[in-house]
């Protein structure tokens, strides 16, 4: 399997990498949160742009991105607008969503973008091509905060992301039972062993799914999300606890 390298970080080998999400509604809070996050132990900074109030002002959005880049220059920066339909804070049109991601790509300030699989096939393919032309990696994602589909469907979605040339396919699902967590883990393992030619990220959410956030190295998930302050999704644990467990499992 090929790995993905962003700055000096190699994703897809060794212990799962830790991603933290920064959620701030204005530039002042972006600045203060960035200073607080700078001391935390993580690998990738995800900026959840759907929490930012002044979305219609692209200059304001990019000014905030510049603050993050300058405050933590060594950390890979993942630009994510999570749509309302997949659990995000704001609803915007597909056109606005694509334009926002294109602006991030063109800015030269971000290393990675999150692109939702179900945005529309043509728009997704075009945006991936645009990102790659600017040496920006694409995490292609799908989130279901209500249920966990069958393993075959999970694998089909991840394979579709791979066929669209996502650098890292990602899926996050809500379990209704412990067996749903096993479904996610089994699908992850099958994808990793039989189909994946690049790193994937998978997780089962809420308290029920916490094991999936810790056992990525065993089953084939290359990264996991931790919390510096407020969790960006149900079931996230603190980065310090997360690093401890990931290290124990890696060294066992």
Curated annotation (Swiss-Prot):
KW RNA-binding (keyword) present: no
Example GO molecular function: 3-dehydroquinate dehydratase activity
CDD domains listed in its UniProt record: DHQase_I
Residue sites binding 3-dehydroquinate per the record: 21, 46-48, 82, 213, 232, 236
Enzyme Commission number(s) from the entry: 4.2.1.10
Protein's UniProt keywords contain Transcription regulation: no
Pathway: Metabolic intermediate biosynthesis; chorismate biosynthesis; chorismate from D-erythrose 4-phosphate and phosphoenolpyruvate: step 3/7
Biological processes annotated in GO: 3,4-dihydroxybenzoate biosynthetic process; amino acid biosynthetic process; aromatic amino acid family biosynthetic process; chorismate biosynthetic process
Active site, per annotation: 143 (proton donor/acceptor), 170 (schiff-base intermediate with substrate)
Catalytic activity: 3-dehydroquinate = 3-dehydroshikimate + H2O
Pfam families: DHquinase_I
EC class of the enzyme, as a word: lyase
Gene3D superfamilies, A to Z: Aldolase class I
Primary role: Involved in the third step of the chorismate pathway, which leads to the biosynthesis of aromatic amino acids. Catalyzes the cis-dehydration of 3-dehydroquinate (DHQ) and introduces the first double bond of the aromatic ring to yield 3-dehydroshikimate.
Assembly, per entry: Homodimer.
Family statement: Belongs to the type-I 3-dehydroquinase family.
NCBIfam families attached to this UniProt entry: aroD (TIGR01093)
Protein's recorded name: 3-dehydroquinate dehydratase
Gene that encodes the chain: aroD
